[in-house]
Every structure is written in structure tokens, then in C-alpha cells.
Amino acid sequence: MASDEPAKVEEGRRDAQGRLIVSKALGIFFSGYLEGSYTQNFNNPSNGINQLRIFDVNANEFRPNVAKFVLDREADANGTGWDRAGFHVKFNAGKDSQFIGGTNLSPYADFQEFYVQYVLPVGTGLDIKAGRINALIGFEGLESSENPNYSRSWLFGLGQPFTTFGIRASYKFSEQVSFSIGGINSVTSSTGDSTNKLMVESALVWTVTERLKATFYGLFGPRPGQRPGSDGNRVLGGGFVSYQLTEKASMVLEAYYANQERASELSRGGNARWDGVAGYLIYDVNKEWGVRFRSEIFEDAGGFVSCNGTESFPKANVCFGATQNRTSRDVAQTLWETTGTLQYRPVASLLTRLEYRYDKSNQNVFQLGNRATSYQPTLTLDVVYFF
């Protein structure tokens, strides 16, 4: 009985990461958060939609973004047998769930991630994961609270995968270099499309110095086109570099290029190309206050990844001219935006953000009242409660 006492004491408490310890003996943890937001669109679009947004689509109204629940067991590369095994389950409920999951459980609830893990005793440990996992591609991710800003960049929201389903292997060659590669047959993204054909994703992480870190990523394989029978190979390659300027300030620069065969009805060769670059400046005034800035340019040369939404739920990636049943016309465009975010975190369990964003296009894809325009200014208050 005495040997069981320490484990019982720890259960029900939280670890250094704030996770609830469900079972110390089994190494199982529980965590999650609730998020809600309100966005004021100064264009006051008559359809109540923020154009070309993915998750923050509701104009001039409150949005119950997500209730996120996570249950996981971490695999220990230094352990033996059962210690090397792990699992991860992440369930979402709320309006942000539409594009995140891959099981189509319901429009407002789905599993974002569910995978099993085992670290093989090869070298420093060959980490194998199988199931649905957040994609390797991109600096930003699905967890809003882990991104510098509340709203997502177009680089992420329009042009990158959200989650993938398949098998992934990761290996740490040294303290400076690690590599991951995955064979996948399903992808979730803002277009909601998927395929059962094999694709490959990869990421190389290089820690150059304590302050400088670089990540290079890639994706290749067949993807659906805009019309039936127009499937073609997609190639996406790029990366991001982060640099710690001072103890309180850091910056990130991301860029990538993507091309898909037979996906565009606007380009002469039929191929769709999209690319972009984004820069971030992150500054923490103290433990409670911080400011974040983002600026990006995104080009959809083939008119393939932007303006694919309708005015029906989930109302994402919508452009002027869309209706309840159809998208707006295909348009090749160059987009750029600037976002500033003031962050206040009075306690570890509460994150609040006030964000101003200005969107601009070389085409009239945004909506001012009931007419088309080329710009869109918004102001958002976002609140996240961690448990």
C-alpha cells in the first residue's frame, strides 16, 4: 500500500504544463480550453461574413469558436516496453470544428487528432505515429492560442493542409537536427477535400544556434481539382526561420511555393500556382502583456485556393458574389494583410487578445455593405480559458 501512495497524491493535480494528471502510474494527462470571440467588420457586409477568412468568419457577432479536450500519454524514448508507447486524442466542439476533423462526426464536433505512438529503440529513438495528426507543414497551426495572432494567415488558411491521416516517422539525429516524414492518404484543409491516394509530407528542423532555428517542409502527391476528373499532383515546398532577437523579442519569416497540375481554369497551362511570404514580430512586455505583428503577401495566380466558399455554413473562404449554393467566380489575385495583436494574460489559465487586421486585394473580392470592394478592416476580441 505504501508504494502506491505517491501516485495517488499526484493524481488530480496538474503538471508543469498545466495538464491534469489522470493517472501518474499510466502517464495519462488531460487538458483543454474554451475559446470565444467577437469580430467587428468595419465594412459592415450585408451577408454578415468576413470575406476570405477561415475560422473568424462571423462579422459583427459573437462566435463560440471551440471547446477543446485532449487526452494523451507521452511515449518515453528512454524507457522500455510500455514506457515507449503513447497515444493522443484531441476532440473539438464548436464552430471551428468544421475543417479541423477528419471523421465528419458532425458540423460542430469532430476529432482533430487521434493517433498511437511508439518509439523504437533505434539510435536516439525512432518515433512512429499512426492515425490523424496535425500536419507538418507551416509555422501557424490549428490551435489559435499557440499562434502569435488570433486570425490565421492566408499562407496557412488558404494554402496549407491542417491535418493528415497516415503513418509518420521522426528521428533526432543530434541536438541540432531532426527529420520527420509521413505517408498519408487523407488531408483536411479549408476546402474540406480529401483523397485516398498516397501523399508524402516531410519536415527538417535545424537548430543553428540557441537563437536561430530553421524548418524546411514539403508535400507531394495527387490532390482533387476544382472539377471532376481534374485531379493532379501537388507539390508544396518552403519553410520558416525564427530568431530570438532579445530575451523578450523574436521574429519569424515564412515563405513557400505550391503548384498543382490541371487545377486552374484561368492559367494557360492549366496548372494552379500559389505562393506567399509572411513576417512576424513577437514582443513580450512582461508575463502579462505582449504585442504581436504580422504582415504577409499571398498570391493565388491560378484562382484555385481562394474564393472557394459559399454563404452557407461554414462560410469560410468566401468572396463577394458568392451565394448560399455557389461560390463566386474564379479570380487570380494577390492578397496582402497587416495584423496587430495586443495580448493580456492576467493568469496562466486566461488569455485575452485584441486584434486589428487590414486586408487588401488587387481585385474587388471583399464586401462593403452590399457592394464589392478591395479592402477589409476588422477588430476582434478573443478570450481563451485553459483547463
Per-region residue spans from a language model:
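Outer membrane beta-barrel
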Residues: Q17-T188, S194-E201, V205-K213, Y280-A301
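Cleavable N-terminal export/targeting peptides
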Residues: M1-K8
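Short structured motifs
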Residues: D15-Q17, T339
